[in-house]
């Protein structure tokens, strides 16, 4: 029997938790054998509360030593603020004892903070990637659904754990059985580990115009060091006037207004999902000063950045992560 430990941290998303544990349960049900045993952990006897208010009680607690093959940490909210040295010490001890260590959604950040991802490839939910690279630029970060690198497993969260668990089941029980488990969840196609976390640019922006798509891709790759309108036009081999006409036609706004809103949306994500300072966020999104950034943010969102960060609007409701 393969024993899987799961530690959700307060603010975790039920979607990530269910996508991780349910395929193991289904594998047992469909095989009529006990291939897998999921063991829930919590930090205290009070249990762990999800972003939607659902509580999970632990079978074991941090520091316990039941026999395990894999141990997963699931984190939501702001994992950058989390700092439990007892947990870091304990999961390092598990790793030293041969347990494969995994992280889901914001969980990979916990593994980085515990010093467990050195010289290992990894992934994390796309909203956390910029902030993670700011604090740990030495990591090997990929934009994948999940990464299995020797004795480390990281997963972006959402529904991606289904594909990750199916990869584990496939390796142990074969392709045919893994597909049977996948079909049980109406999950017709098992996605590869390197599959994209987000829909492609065409679907996200709603146009197939090649000049608009090329310009937006350049914008997304130059948030901290914004390009000028002249540079965007030259790189797309169109005139500034033509590029502005394209953006007016498809987005009802000028090129640079679109670019500024893109940077402000990224700043909003960082305010919601990181503990970076206002100055750091303004720098990461290409605004020359905190005051300039705050003024633009206020005009666009009707709230100053500090008030937005502290408001009830963003209180650990982590959508589907």
Q: Can you annotate each of these PLM segments?
A:
Residues 2-63:
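N-terminal beta1-alpha1 cap of cysteine-dependent amidohydrolase-like domains
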Residues 39-101:
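Flexible gly/pro-rich beta->alpha loop and the following alpha-helix that scaffold active-site loops
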Residues 90-127:
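Catalytic nucleophile loop
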Residues 117-145, 180-181:
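A conserved active-site-flanking secondary-structure segment within enzyme catalytic domains
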Residues 146-155, 172-217, 221, 235, ...:
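Short, Lys/Arg-enriched, Trp-marked, Pro/Gly-tolerant hinge/linker segments that flank
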Residues 170-174, 211-228, 247, 268-277, ...:
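Basic, amphipathic alpha-helical hairpins
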Residues 218-220, 229-262, 282-307:
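Basic/polar phosphate-binding segments, predominantly the helix-turn-helix DNA-binding elements
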Residues 273, 277, 291-321:
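…primarily DNA-binding HTH/wHTH and HhH modules…
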């Amino acid at each position: 029997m393969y024993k899987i430990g799961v530690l959700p941290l307060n603010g975790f998303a039920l979607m990530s938790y269910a996508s991780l544990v349910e395929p193991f349960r289904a594998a047992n049900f469909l095989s009529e054998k006990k291939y897998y045993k999921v063991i829930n952990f919590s930090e205290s006897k009070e249990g762990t509360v999800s972003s939607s208010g659902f509580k999970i009680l632990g079978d074991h607690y941090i520091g316990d030593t039941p026999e395990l093959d894999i141990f997963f940490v699931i984190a939501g909210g702001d994992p950058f603020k989390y700092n439990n040295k007892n947990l870091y010490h304990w999961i390092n001890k598990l790793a030293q004892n041969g347990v494969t260590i995994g992280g889901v959604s914001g969980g990979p950040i916990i593994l980085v903070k515990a010093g467990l991802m050195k010289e290992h490839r990894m992934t994390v939910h796309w909203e956390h990637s910029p902030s993670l690279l700011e604090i740990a630029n030495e990591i090997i970060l990929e934009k994948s659904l999940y990464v299995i690198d020797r004795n480390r497993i990281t997963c972006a969260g959402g529904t991606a754990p289904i594909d990750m668990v199916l990869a584990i089941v496939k390796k142990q029980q074969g392709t045919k059985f893994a597909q049977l488990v996948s079909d049980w969840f109406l999950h017709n196609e098992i996605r590869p580990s390197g599959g994209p976390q987000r829909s492609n640019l065409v679907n996200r922006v709603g146009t197939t115009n090649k000049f608009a798509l090329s310009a937006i891709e350049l914008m997304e790759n130059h948030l901290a060091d914004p390009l000028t309108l002249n540079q965007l036009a030259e790189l797309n081999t169109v005139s500034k006037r033509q590029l502005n006409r394209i953006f007016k036609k498809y987005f009802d706004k000028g090129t640079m207004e679109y670019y500024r809103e893109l940077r402000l949306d990224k700043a909003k994500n960082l305010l919601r999902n990181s503990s970076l300072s206002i100055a750091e966020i303004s720098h990461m999104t290409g605004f020359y000063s905190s005051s300039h950034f705050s003024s633009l943010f206020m005009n666009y969102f009707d709230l100053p950045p500090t008030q937005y960060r502290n408001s009830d609007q963003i209180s650990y409701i982590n959508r589907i992560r």
